Amino acid sequence: MNLTDRIALVTGGGRGIGRAVSILLASLGAEVVINYVNRPQAADETAAFIRQQGGKAESLGFDVARAGDVQAAVKDILARHARLDILVNNAGITRDGLLVKMKEEAWDAVLDTNLKGSFNCLKAVSRAMMKQRWGRIINITSVIGFTGNAGQVNYAAAKAGLLGLTKSAARELAPRGITVNGVAPGYIETEMTSGLPAEVSAGIMAAIPLKTLGKPDDVAGAVAYLASDSANYITGQVIHVNGGLYM
């Protein structure tokens, strides 16, 4: 796969899955803009690592949940790079809690970042990609968007919403040469899963046919494929990366 001279924006690109995606896209030749909102050190370190490996990367802070901030950031990227080819909507948070105890603030925070944030970014980049008549948009959803999960009604709703956003945007943007697809990770070795209680981890492992958690690089590989010319004829689809947890 060759992404030479492609300009890519990866939201939440400094840690976990986002970091793996940023590093892989850069290794394939893309110039990567690594977004962060409150952890500049992680984004800066990832960008520095990429540059040390001979790649091109920079960090850029903005809140995906704020439409005005997103529009300003995309305008800045276009002013400096003249184009924007790849968007990876990876930024996401959790605010877990049982339905009957969940506060409105927890619901709003997750929907604002995980769903509205993806919409904001998708909308902001679409016009530039339409002018280019080429673009790749990859939304990071989740197995939880398909199966649901007790204690995560907000997260599940946001990730399921991303599925509808992906398919509808794919239909709208296809005539302009833009593909929109999703990648749905299962349980991946990240900060989000490292704090799970032992009994919860054991239950998860028992449900995964491959009997192991995935790695961020597993997800990054699917993203890179969808961002490449190898996936020219794929749009409105979701690639599952879950070890067989959901079939």
Question: What is the predicted function of each stretch?
Answer:
Residues 2, 122, 134, 178, ...:
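C-terminal substrate-recognition "lid" of short-chain dehydrogenase/reductases
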Residues 7, 14-16:
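Conserved glycine-rich cofactor-binding loop
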Residues 98-99, 103-111, 193, 204:
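Substrate-binding pocket helix/loop in short-chain dehydrogenase/reductase
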Residues 122, 158, 166:
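Active-site helix of classical SDR
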Residues 127, 171-175, 232:
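Alpha-helical segment proximal to the catalytic Tyr-Lys
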Residues 142:
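Residue(s) in the substrate-gating loop at a strand-loop-helix junction
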